[in-house]
């Protein structure tokens, strides 16, 4: 199966932000969609600063979306927003925790500074990025769809 790279862009990040913002609330539990949208430009700036130095290289769609979602969740939580209770389930909380932990681990370790090679293996759902002698990031998809 041919490997088709995509590139992370600020537009990708904005799309992901808009897809998840509707179910976030402020610390008082009130839906704050319009307020968060006012924060969108600042959040996008942080997402952009996070993406471009490290991820302006071809990566797969699944990894791109996961990294954007996880990082945006980190940014929203840092601003005091919480998931809307109606949208939460035990499964979604556990999945989000795994995803965010994985994104933070990769960010903190610097493991996601991608090298020149990218490989996608079918069947096992494993993504490996990096180059010989360089940093390599490996993602396996669980039955719940979390990457880490």
Summary of predicted features, one role per range:
Residues 1-67, 128-148:
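Conserved short "hinge" loops at termini or chain/domain junctions
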Residues 3-4, 78-148:
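Short loop/turn elements at secondary-structure junctions
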Residues 42, 46, 71, 75-79, ...:
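Generic beta-strand or strand-like secondary-structure segments
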Residues 53, 65-89:
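Ordered, amphipathic secondary-structure segments that act as subunit-interaction surfaces
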